[in-house]
């Protein structure tokens, strides 16, 4: 049994997701097992564009962007599970969210750790669970659905 980790750097992430700055919210994948789990990180800095207005006096990362980042992590797991890439003829779309809960704010200097698990996949629709932590402390948890759809050319 190998202890080698399956990692992804930013180049491979950009080959697997259609998102680009300022909406690419995953910096690195630390490990993944296709069809099972993915662990990724996002380094949050004061230079993030959303901090200009949310909130200038007390910068806090918007919860919807934490969920979007979690959805991007599930998209990476889906692409790796299906051995697909953004250059193929389909995209994974954020299709639904349930049981989203926030437990802690995210501030500049935090490093988000995403842990997503594939629950099931059927007919191009994937169901995932995810948690986000900072320094081991729970930030957010949710169930996310994403749907694979062909790109119309």
From Swiss-Prot:
GO molecular function, one term: (3R)-hydroxyacyl-[acyl-carrier-protein] dehydratase activity
Coiled coil region boundaries: none
One cellular-component annotation, GO: membrane
Lineage: superkingdom: Bacteria
GO biological process, one term: fatty acid biosynthetic process
Database matches in InterPro entries: FabA_FabZ, FabZ, HotDog_dom_sf
Compartment(s) where it occurs, according to its Swiss-Prot or TrEMBL record: Cytoplasm
Keyword Lipid biosynthesis tagged: yes
Role summary: Involved in unsaturated fatty acids biosynthesis. Catalyzes the dehydration of short chain beta-hydroxyacyl-ACPs and long chain saturated and unsaturated beta-hydroxyacyl-ACPs.
Family: Belongs to the thioester dehydratase family. FabZ subfamily.
Protein's UniProt name: 3-hydroxyacyl-[acyl-carrier-protein] dehydratase FabZ
Species this protein is from: Shewanella sediminis (strain HAW-EB3)
């Amino acid at each position: 049994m190998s202890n080698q980790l399956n990692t992804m750097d930013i180049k491979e992430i950009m080959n697997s997701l259609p998102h680009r700055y300022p909406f690419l919210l995953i910096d690195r994948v630390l490990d993944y097992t296709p069809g099972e789990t993915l662990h990724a990180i996002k380094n949050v800095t004061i230079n993030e564009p959303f901090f200009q207005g949310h909130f200038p006096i007390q910068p806090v990362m918007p919860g919807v962007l934490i969920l979007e980042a979690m959805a991007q992590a599930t998209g990476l797991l889906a692409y790796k599970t299906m051995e697909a890439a953004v250059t193929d003829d389909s995209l994974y779309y954020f299709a639904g969210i349930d049981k989203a809960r926030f437990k802690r704010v995210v501030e500049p200097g935090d490093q988000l750790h995403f842990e997503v698990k594939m629950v099931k996949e059927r007919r191009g629709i994937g169901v995932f669970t995810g948690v986000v932590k900072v320094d081991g402390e729970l930030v957010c948890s949710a169930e996310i659905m994403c749907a694979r759809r062909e790109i119309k050319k």
